[in-house]
Amino acid sequence: MSEDDYRQLQSALVIRPDMGDLIPGSGGLRKLRWRIPGRGKRGGVRVIYYWVMSREEIWMLLAYAKAKKEDLSPQQVKLLRRIVESWNNG
């Protein structure tokens, strides 16, 4: 993802921080499918982020190519949930 693509993603999330789907059992993590122009049908990325409503912040946790991986494993979701919990409590 280029810097310009990342800025476009950030701008979209500022406007609609709830645009990603909630990941069940994740404690509020969201998954967003983001298309990157010129890369074809499978050329986009999936972005995992957490929206901290009380602080009006969005924490970007993970981005990966759609062509490489469909969903996070339950273990990955659990680990990311623990990371967010530690940030919220720390």
Q: What does each model-found stretch correspond to?
A:
Residues 51-90:
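Enriched for short, Lys/Arg-rich terminal
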Residues 1-31:
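N-terminal first-folded block
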Residues 42-47:
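Short, surface-exposed coil-to-beta transition loops
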Residues 34:
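Short glycine-centered, acidic/aromatic-flanked micro-motifs in structured strand/loop junctions
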